[in-house]
Regions:
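N-terminal pre-Walker A segment at the start of P-loop NTPase domains
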Residues: 1-18, 66
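Intrinsically disordered, low-complexity eukaryotic regions enriched in glycine, serine
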Residues: 3-7, 77-82
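Short, functional N-terminal and low-complexity linear motifs
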Residues: 6-11, 59, 134-136
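Short coil/loop residues immediately preceding or within conserved phosphate-binding loops
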Residues: 24
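Conserved P-loop NTPase motor cores
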Residues: 27-49, 54-57, 64-68, 78-144
Length: 144
């Protein structure tokens, strides 16, 4: 997978069958504030049909702070402030495979055992690709 310019001179992901993401997968996108984590994720979601080996049926974006750029992907993506209580129930069998994004929630995630469970059990059993956006790859916390 690599970035290229499309017809409108916008960045686009190019991939072949060998470089598509498996479903489910776990992705961590880490970097300092304003480095493009959300922009990268937005582009990934806009091109999800070609970047994942199977067609994604449900996308849930959990955020800590609303950003105007979310409107660009809003028609296909459901947005939730914070971390929902019962994540598996949000991805019933008819909505799989799915993608769950946790953006700017490291304060909420570091001491939440559900996040550990999400990346291990829930991701596999509910066929959900988890994408975690963070500024600090190793925040202090009980479960990190």
């Amino acid at each position: 997978m690599f970035a290229s310019k499309n017809f409108h001179n916008q960045s686009a992901f190019c991939c072949d069958k060998m470089s598509q993401f498996k479903c489910p997968s776990s992705l961590i996108i880490a970097g300092p504030s304003q480095c493009g984590k959300t922009t990268f994720t937005r582009q990934l979601l806009q091109q999800a049909d070609s970047l994942f080996e199977r067609s994604i049926r449900e996308i849930l974006y959990c955020y800590g702070q609303w950003q105007e750029c979310f409107k660009d992907i809003a028609p296909r993506v459901a947005f939730v402030e914070g971390i929902p209580e019962d994540i598996p129930s949000l991805f019933p069998p008819n909505c799989r495979p799915g993608i769950l994004i946790l953006d700017d929630l490291m304060r909420n995630c570091s001491d939440d055992e559900r996040i550990l469970d999400l990346f291990t059990n829930v991701s596999h059993h509910c066929d959900v690709t988890c994408i975690y956006l963070t500024q600090n790859l190793f925040p202090p916390g009980k479960f990190s």
